[in-house]
């Protein structure tokens, strides 16, 4: 006869059910464990990016090296893109997914660090503080909200394609006004993605997909930061 004492371990059938469903429908302790993993990984990613950027800003030799070799930004960006593709293919392969996660974060951190060397340190600090405040506020709002944000996905991805196209056209028709408008729209777009991805990690992902959840939020943070940085510089030029 099965033991119904709550002190006994749960059955494997219950575990299979919880891990086969989305996070929101899993048991409380699985939800909390998932969130701890996601935000612990995310915190380490942001920490690595912050430290790397600070080193590039502090040491003049690194700044000079980047300014003399701006193609490094493209190399790091392409490396990040390739690693994202590999992570998508091996998202459930442990511990390979964690090794790929570290490599991706390092590559992305180097790309961001290279970019910020072209900006004033004061503007970088402002953008960092604004990004942190916005992310924490939107995360708190989304996690306690009862609204279904998945319906905004199509609009957000359409907006992303439009933003990419506008960014390409900007290469040929650059103006400070266009830079300001695109930076503003980009920042608003990635605020939307933070809400969408925070909602999705609870309602669309399974508990074992914490690596993908962390990467999605990390990319939202990086893109929000970079667009805020562009916005602040554009405003500063006016």
Curated annotation (Swiss-Prot):
CDD domains: GAAP_like
Keyword tags: Apoptosis, Golgi apparatus, Membrane, Transmembrane, Transmembrane helix
Keyword check for Ubl conjugation: no
Lumenal side: 60-68, 119-120, 173-175
Cited Pfam families: Bax1-I (PF01027)
Gene Ontology cellular-component annotations: endoplasmic reticulum membrane; Golgi membrane; Golgi stack
Parts of the chain in the membrane but not crossing it: 209-229
Regions crossing the membrane: 39-59, 69-89, 98-118, 121-141, 152-172, 176-196
Cytoplasmic compartment residues: 1-38, 90-97, 142-151, 197-208, 230-238
Subcellular locations according to the entry: Golgi apparatus membrane
InterPro entries on file: Bax_inhibitor_1-related (IPR006214)
Membrane topology: Multi-pass membrane protein
GO BP term, pick one: regulation of calcium-mediated signaling
Function: Anti-apoptotic protein which can inhibit apoptosis induced by intrinsic and extrinsic apoptotic stimuli. Can modulate both capacitative Ca2+ entry and inositol 1,4,5-trisphosphate (IP3)-mediated Ca2+ release.
Subunit details: Interacts with ITPR3.
Family assignment from sequence similarity: Belongs to the BI1 family. LFG subfamily.
The protein, known as: Protein lifeguard 4
């Amino acid at each position: 006869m099965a033991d119904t004492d709550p002190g006994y371990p749960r059955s494997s059938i219950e575990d299979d059910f919880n891990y086969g469903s989305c996070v929101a429908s899993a048991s409380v302790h699985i939800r909390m464990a998932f969130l701890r993993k996601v935000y612990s990984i995310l915190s380490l990613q942001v920490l690595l990016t912050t430290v790397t950027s600070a080193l590039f800003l502090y040491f003049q030799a690194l700044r000079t090296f980047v300014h003399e070799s701006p193609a490094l930004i493209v190399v790091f960006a392409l490396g990040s893109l390739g690693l994202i593709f590999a992570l998508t293919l091996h998202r459930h392969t442990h511990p390979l997914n964690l090794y790929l996660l570290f490599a991706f974060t390092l590559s992305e951190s180097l790309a961001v660090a290279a970019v910020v060397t072209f900006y004033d340190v004061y503007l970088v600090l402002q953008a960092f503080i604004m990004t942190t405040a916005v992310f924490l506020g939107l995360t708190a709002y989304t996690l306690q909200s009862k609204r279904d944000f998945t319906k905004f996905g199509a609009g957000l991805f359409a907006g992303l394609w439009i933003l990419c196209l506008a960014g390409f056209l900007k290469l040929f028709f650059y103006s400070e006004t266009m830079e300001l408008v695109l930076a503003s729209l980009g920042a608003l777009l990635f605020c939307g993605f933070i809400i969408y991805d925070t909602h999705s990690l609870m309602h669309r992902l399974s508990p074992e997909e914490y690596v993908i959840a962390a990467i999605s939020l990390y990319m939202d943070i990086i893109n929000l930061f970079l667009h805020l940085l562009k916005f602040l510089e554009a405003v500063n030029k006016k």
